[in-house]
Amino acid sequence: PHNLDLLQWICGLPCRVRAFCHNGKWHQIEVEDDVTAYLEFPNGATGVFVTTTADAPGTNRFEITLERGKLVAEHDKLTFFELEQSERDFCFTATGGFEQPAGHEVTIELDGKNPQHVGVLNAFAGAILRGEPLVADGTEGIRGLELSNAMHLSSWTDQTVTLPIDEALFLEKLNEHRKASKVKTEVTEVTFDTSDSYGSKVSDNTDKGGVKA
């Protein structure tokens, strides 16, 4: 869910969602493990969200295409490909059939700080003890949940849904899935180490914008 939080935090909530959520497609589970969603935003922008738990080595990429360039966050780096003129202006003035607007790539320098869970918890404690600002308040959590619920509802009904969603219909469909849930009869106990997924990342190479664990 973290990438959904980032998506709506940075881009805002979409107004329409069409999603395809596959439950137990790759694992013996009753929740989604393969999702593709198409998003439409109030300003006319569109987006695509794709995720799966069966992709190795996996992709963690956040891309925003703008009129004057493109932002890409991937491999702990933020890159901006800056165009010399607006793509919209170039589109209607270029005379060649396959020309592209000129531009150059810029690696955005980061501060090297990426505290992740530790930073969120420290900010939460600081807000209680000293009134310090949170990384994100409860409203952001509700918005991320709204987007997740919209994707589920779209997939369950096989329709495009508008936001805010019909909460009564969502609860109805959720309860249908609850009733259809089955208890696993064969369970294998395992020890699952989550230490590598919890903590913070601090760069020792801030001049290049890189972040190392």
Residue locations for each model-derived region?
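Rossmann-like dinucleotide-binding domain that binds NAD(P)(H)
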Residues: P1-T46, T51-P57, E63, T139
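Short arginine-rich
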Residues: L147-T157
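C-terminal glycine/acidic-rich active-site capping loop/insertion
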Residues: T36, F41, L66-T139, V161, ...
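C-terminal structured "cap/appendage" subdomains that terminate the fold
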Residues: I142-R143
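Residues at helix-coil transition
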Residues: G12, G126-R130, W156
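Short, acidic/polar N-cap/turn motifs at the starts of alpha helices
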Residues: D34-T36, T59-R61, R68, M151, ...
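A general structural signal for well-ordered alpha-helical segments in protein cores
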Residues: N3-L4, H117, L121-N122, S148
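Residue-level signal for well-ordered alpha-helical scaffold segments within enzymatic catalytic domains
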Residues: L6-W9, A123-A127, A150
